Structure formats: C-alpha cells, structure tokens
Swiss-Prot record:
Covalent S-S links between cysteines: none
Name this polypeptide is given: Small ribosomal subunit protein uS2
InterPro entries in the record: Ribosomal_uS2, Ribosomal_uS2_bac/mit/plastid, Ribosomal_uS2_CS, Ribosomal_uS2_flav_dom_sf
Organism expressing this protein natively: Thermosynechococcus vestitus (strain NIES-2133 / IAM M-273 / BP-1)
Lineage: Bacteria, Bacillati, Cyanobacteriota, Cyanophyceae, Acaryochloridales
SUPFAM superfamilies hit by this protein: Ribosomal protein S2
GO cellular component entries: cytosolic small ribosomal subunit
One annotated GO molecular function: structural constituent of ribosome
Region (Disordered): 228-263
GO biological process, one term: translation
C-alpha cells in the first residue's frame, strides 16, 4: 500500500509548483506539465519518492538515528515544531543561525545557557534579582528559547536532516554537506534536487501540502522507533490554506542570538 495516495496529494495541493518562469531546470524530470503559467508536479514521482524517504527514515530510526527538522518559513514553522515533537526529534523553525551545525561547540554553550536560565526561572532565582536584571534575564531566556528551544536536548550532531524548502534553507544545506549529514527534503519547482539525498518534489508553500508530507516523515520516525503508529510522546529527554506563492528567501543570521527587534 502506498504511503501517500494521489487523491491525498491532490486534495492537499501538493502538485502546484511555482510560476514556470521561476523554475530550476534541474527539476524538469519531476514536472508533469504547465497550466496557466504554473508548473504542475508529477505526483506519481512524488509518491514514489515519499515512499523511498519513508522507508529510509524508518530504517534509520530503527537503528537509533537522530533527526533534525528544518523549516523556518512562515507556512512551515508550526508544522515543523509540531511534527518534530510528535516523533521525538529536534527542530529549527526560526532563523537558521550561521554555524548551528558546523560550529556546534559554540552553539552548545548557548544551549547550556538556555538550560541554566530555565533552571533559574523554575527555581525562582530570577525573581530574587533586582527588577532590571531580572527583566534582562527573562528577555535573554525568551530569545534563547525562540531560536534554540528545538535543539535544547541535542547533545550531538543529527544523523539525518529533514528540510522544507532547500532554496530558503541554503545555509543549513551547506552545513549538512560540509558535515556529511544526509538530507531528505521537500522541494518545489524552483529548487535544485541535486543538493539533497532524497528529494520530494512538492508544493513547499501550501500549509496542507507541507503538513501532509512532513507528517508522513514524522510517522516514519515514530514507526521505526516504536514498531507501530500511535500518538507518541515527545522522546528527547534521554538524548545527550493551499497558497501558491513563495515567501522571500531569508538571509542567514550570524552566530549571535538576535534581539527580538531584529526578528
């Protein structure tokens, strides 16, 4: 039985690509036709690649591999967080901080600071500080939670990255390449499929499309770890509308955690 049916993908708008003038020619093998100036993705190939990705991820999860979901665009951010937590994985759904993987040792010091501040907040120690200092500490805590909360329990680099929109997340892709981390990615007709290990051609701007595919990849992780699909608990503690428009590509941020005013 197929992981995803054509009917499911059609209903979610997975087949809608970008305007033909915005395409990446390397996506040509995955394009079915052009309608009203918009590329239509070949869903037969999408279904095959979703199944390939599902089996690959499930098998990796069975072996104890760890996964990092990456998706910072508005349409993907909430889904990435929800599905990563559902299957006990890590996630980045805000700005990608330069060096988040390649400079992990430094990033880890900020993660440790996040844990320290959370402990201080929970124990009431922040309340004992002068008002101005307490306010500054809480602002710092909020910033760290926003940008690093999804990797708070990540003690080592992930084994596999699952990315929504490799064109937008180009810095994350580059860091994965440098470190030899395999990439499974949902990518639209304006992306380069040669940049990833398993490309899943799909509408990466429609919420329902993203939810459908990212949800299936999260299912694969959960099934690999637990042997069946049930509603899981977050499992991190032990580990050191069908829009067709795209959001603008976001620039990568420096290693410093940005202030909220810069977000």
């Amino acid at each position: 039985m197929a992981v995803l049916s054509l009917a499911q993908m059609l209903e979610a708008g997975v087949h809608f690509g970008h305007q033909a003038r915005r395409w990446n020619p390397r996506m040509a093998p995955y394009i079915f036709t052009v309608r009203n100036g918009v590329h239509i993705i070949d869903l037969v190939q999408t279904a095959q690649l979703v199944e390939e990705a599902y089996n690959y991820i499930r098998n990796a999860a069975e072996k104890g591999k760890r996964f990092l979901f990456i998706g910072t665009k508005r349409q993907a951010a909430g889904i990435v967080e929800q599905e990563a937590l559902r299957c006990g994985s890590y996630y980045v759904n805000q700005r990608w901080l330069g060096g988040m993987l390649t400079n992990w040792t430094t990033i880890k010091t900020r993660v440790d600071r996040l844990k320290e501040l959370e402990s201080m907040e929970e124990s009431g120690l922040i309340d004992l500080r002068p008002k101005q200092e307490a306010s500054a500490l809480r602002r710092e805590l909020a910033r760290l939670q926003k940008y690093l909360g999804g990797i708070k329990q990540m003690r080592r680099l992930p084994d596999i990255a699952i990315i929504v929109d490799v064109k937008r997340e180009y810095n994350a892709v580059a860091e994965c390449h440098k470190l030899g981390i395999p990439i499974v990615a949902l990518l639209d007709t304006n992306c380069d499929p040669t940049q990833v290990d398993i490309p899943i051609p799909a509408n990466d701007d429609a919420i329902r499309s993203i939810k459908l595919i990212v949800g299936k990849l999260a299912d694969a992780i959960y099934e690999g770890r637990h042997g069946q699909l049930e509603e899981p608990e977050a499992d991190l503690a032990d580990e050191d509308d069908n829009g067709m428009t795209t959001s603008d590509d976001g620039d990568a941020e420096a290693l410093d955690i940005p202030d909220d005013s810069d977000a």
